């Protein structure tokens, strides 16, 4: 029935002279989202709108599912597009549309007509009234309700084409990917960091990710778990380059030479340093973490102060004020929760002190870091140089 989808967007519409940049980015992301959907589609801007036109048979539910993951979209409207062959033809097409779209006709409705072509022989109010009358004649069981109709019939007269639709599937909102710069996500196998990546991507940020692997203490299944999480996030963010850093030697050096109650915070400091260096080399302008205040020892205010101090890039923590259940709710919504709870430990959970410091003093931490002098420099360089890059699409 539907050969086209009208894409509605929110914030993009107020971007003034730069609007086309955001619209083009949204078109690219829509095309990416449909690449694995069976069928052929044409995505284009036309008359101030974005349309997805189906050029072959397709699975309706699959298209809707893909489009509801595209940031920047606030509504997806399956439309029937007709040529302007006069009002009688329009009325017949509307009646045919309602007959097919709604098996139960015992519904209230409202007609909302709009014209961009002002030379149409009827104004919007006249179209509303005439179409409403034709609908009542065709379906006597339907009733008019202009305040809270069950069916809001939209009729848009644009140039020589008329759009007819009454269904609007909510989109995720946000901004198109790539319109707000690029950031490096510190991605672990936990619940929080995939959610953090999702949330900054929603604001138009392109995501790259870094995962710290510690073989033989962490398994290949733990690594695959993170790859799977990156794939889930990429359904929303678009392609992700995943940097897999071999962190074992650095962790062992910290374990052997630094106070055990400071293991977590010092390891976290080196993770931030490495992620920032990798990010600088690929054009990132910030770091993203899944830290939430007070959730674990490395996420107290004092601990976050210490890890922030080593970074020159801004550090974004989208879930900083969320409690655990709020983060879990989002992870379930985006489909990452079941993967995150798979029982494969990463390096953050293996080298953990029994009684980690919760109020680290930055000056003392820096002093204890000097225990690594003469050792850490070469290990750090090797970790950067041997980083494995995996492109997730």
Residue ranges and their predicted role:
Residues 230-257, 346:
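A conserved beta-strand->alpha-helix junction
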């Amino acid at each position: 029935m539907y050969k086209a989808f009208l894409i509605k967007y929110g914030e993009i519409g107020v971007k003034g002279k730069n609007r086309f940049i955001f619209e083009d980015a949204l078109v690219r992301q829509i095309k990416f989202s449909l690449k694995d959907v069976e069928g052929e589609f044409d995505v284009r801007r036309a008359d101030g709108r974005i349309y997805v036109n189906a050029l072959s048979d397709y699975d309706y539910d699959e298209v809707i599912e893909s489009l509801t993951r595209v940031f920047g979209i606030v509504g997806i409207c399956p439309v029937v597009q007709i040529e302007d062959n006069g009002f009688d033809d329009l009325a017949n097409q509307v009646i045919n549309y309602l007959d097919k779209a709604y098996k139960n006709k015992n519904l209230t409705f409202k007609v909302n007509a709009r014209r961009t072509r002002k030379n149409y022989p009827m104004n919007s109010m006249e179209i509303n009234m005439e179409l409403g009358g034709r609908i009542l004649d065709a379906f006597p069981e339907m009733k008019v309700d202009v305040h809270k109709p069950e069916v809001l019939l939209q009729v848009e007269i644009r140039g020589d084409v008329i759009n007819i639709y009454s269904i609007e599937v909510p989109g995720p909102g946000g901004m198109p990917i790539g319109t707000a710069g690029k950031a490096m996500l510190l991605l672990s196998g936990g619940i929080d960091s995939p959610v953090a990546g999702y949330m900054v991507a929603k604001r138009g940020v392109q995501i790259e990710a870094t995962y710290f692997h510690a073989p033989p203490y962490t398994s290949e299944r733990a690594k695959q778990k993170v790859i799977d999480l990156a794939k889930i996030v990429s359904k929303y963010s678009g392609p992700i380059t995943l940097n897999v850093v071999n962190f074992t030697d650095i962790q062992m050096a910290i374990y052997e030479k630094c106070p055990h109650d400071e293991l977590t915070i010092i390891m976290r400091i080196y993770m931030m340093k490495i992620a920032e260096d990798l990010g600088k080399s690929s054009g990132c302008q910030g770091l993203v973490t899944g830290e939430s205040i007070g959730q674990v020892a490395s996420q107290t205010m004092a601990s976050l102060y210490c890890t922030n101090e080593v970074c020159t890039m801004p550090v974004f923590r989208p879930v900083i004020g969320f409690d655990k259940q709020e983060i879990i709710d989002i992870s379930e919504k985006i489909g990452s929760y079941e993967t995150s709870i798979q029982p494969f430990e990463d390096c953050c959970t293996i080298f953990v002190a029994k009684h980690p410091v919760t109020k680290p003093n930055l000056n003392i931490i820096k002093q204890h870091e000097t225990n690594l002098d003469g050792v850490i420099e070469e290990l750090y360089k090797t970790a950067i140089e041997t980083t494995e890059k995996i492109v997730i699409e």
